[in-house]
């Protein structure tokens, strides 16, 4: 076979191969090889004129290659100088073209190829097409709206590499070249004209162009488009958004290899916000817990529904129970019709309450509240001329006439303020602190915007099964977290240490936890603050335990467990039974004075259940224990004196004794020192116990006179020593008697003198 014929066959095949490679994703090495082949083709001579109908000619660059134009006319035996003076027709095809060339099968096949890809943005609504030239005709610019041109151009034997970032796009039935890849991709995916009438003719089906369909980023994806993504400070940026498998990927550009954002759809909640007077776009909001991680804007409702459909399919569980499909990713669809919301306004009361889901997502409730505010649009004109708070008050006043009086609404906010189970706390919402009025009721923590507005709540958390953990960094020492299954449900912050301790004690009781405030781990606080928190937490813990309804009928005395109560309690005397009978009679009448307040103490909590006789018995028990410890302390002190005296004598004997008995004496001295050390440790333990007993005795005596008690110390005379220590006086005790308060023995007061006791206290503080 002749070499020239082989070359004539090889050049078109190479040109076709390069045109196919333009539509493929190539590596860098392959791309370099392709450019090398293109440069070799550039050095070769142009093809004969019979193959011109197959090639694409970029007529915008014909002025730079007259030699190539002259070669085109060699086959037609025509002089180019005779054609230069002829006028040009810009909008019509050449009439002198031969019908054989016009009807050639190569031209018909070339019409099915994709349009050319110019280096510069072409004018709108037309592209350039090269046609074979007949004798006596010059090259012309031909505008067309219904045809397609071949795929590549060769100018002066030069192979032009098309830029894949300028895809061809067919919009509204017209084919044009786009120089913006994001506009091309988004518009080629679907029509964004959402305001067109339904009576119009249906638009042609939009398909992905071949250049974009072959992109590496959108391969094997469920859906993809260029969507607007909301940035941190409210700006919008167009990014390539792709859903592949169960993940949503965002690319800043179609040329990126790695996604800018990767989001797992099975761990997100999606909220669809339709376009209305407040929202200028159709939005899809993706949230994880209480954090908004992504906001995408769509240009039509149909596009939003299509994306939601794909998200439901992706989030669908592998196997549902009894054929019921429950998506792992809850998609919250809002009400789309405003008329429907206005009609519900006439039937339901006008309130600001928002339903709370299981995940207690503050963001989801806020969005639902925003969408539900469409029900108040009947007062839009009235609200437009005043502040938002004033409009809310007017709405609430109008809503009062629609509401029925409930039993819970009879309680005013003033009575709520007196209950220690409520107060102001700072709540962390969307990485910002907001002050909320918090209230505990029925094992649920309610959050209100104001203490005057108790009819509605912003959020509510069921506390059963939750845990509380103090600490949220060194900048927030009084903050604590509520956890459910080791995940944060809410982060709260108190104003001071006492307030923090009070809330910790109340929350522990409402959660049903067996952990006490002392057992919690506190960070970022000093010793004094820790003592204040634990003390307040202990008091509130005991108070909340006493207020729990553990009996089917109400009782006057609180059922508070004593912190170290013995199993065997002494028998209550007749006076206590009389008091108990009197209290039961008062229970039948159900007349309890709500203004009577009792200050509770942690160590003498049982006196509120058994009255003043219980406090008296506790005080006498502490007196007996105190005297017992003092006797043991005196015994140990006497033994220590004897041991030290014996050790002193042995040391004197060592100095004066010969060498034979020295070793035995040293061993005896070592034994005595060990005994002295053990006795000293025992004495220190007794000192600490004695201090604790004296403090409890003082607390019980401080509560006793408030109930009309008077406890005298045990006399040390021989005649009264044989009397029972815990006998109850037969005569009734005086109430609020100042003279009885002055009869307290000075021996009851704890003595803080002595260096040993001082050292023991310091050692105990360091140990804790």
Curated annotation (Swiss-Prot):
Q: Where in the cell is it found?
A: Cytoplasm; Cell projection, Podosome; Cell projection, Invadopodium; Cytoplasm, Cytoskeleton, Stress fiber
- The record places domain PH at 220-316, 418-512
Q: Give the record's keywords alphabetically.
A: Cell junction, Cell projection, Coiled coil, Cytoplasm, Cytoskeleton, Phosphoprotein, Repeat
Task: State the SMART domains in the record.
Answer: PH (SM00233)
Q: Tell me which SUPFAM superfamilies the record gives.
A: PH domain-like
UniProt keyword Oxidoreductase present: no
Compositional bias (Polar residues): 710-729
Residues of the signal peptide:
none
- Which spans does this entry mark as compositional bias, Basic and acidic residues? 587-596, 759-768
For this protein, the record's Pfam families field holds: PH
Entry keyword Coiled coil: yes
Tell me the segments the record calls region Disordered.
82-145, 173-211, 566-604, 705-768
User: Any transmembrane segments, and where?
Assistant: none
Q: Low complexity compositional bias: what residue ranges?
A: 177-190
- Tissue-specific expression: Expressed in breast, colon and brain. In all 3 tissues, expressed in the microvasculature (at protein level). In addition, in the breast, found in the contractile myoepithelial cell layer which surrounds the breast ducts (at protein level). In the colon, expressed in the mucous membrane and colonic crypts and in the smooth muscle cell layer which provide movement of the colon (at protein level). In the cerebellum, localized around the Purkinje neurons and the granule cells of the granular layer, but not inside cell bodies (at protein level).
Coiled coil spans: 611-700
Gene Ontology CC: anchoring junction; cell projection; cytosol; podosome; stress fiber
Question: Where does the record place the modification Phosphotyrosine?
Answer: 557
| Known partners and oligomeric status | Interacts with CTTN.
Q: What role is this protein assigned?
A: May be involved in podosome and invadosome formation.
Protein name (database record): Actin filament-associated protein 1-like 1
Which species is this record about?
Homo sapiens
Q: What is the lineage of its organism?
A: Eukaryota, Metazoa, Chordata, Craniata, Vertebrata
Q: Which gene encodes it?
A: AFAP1L1
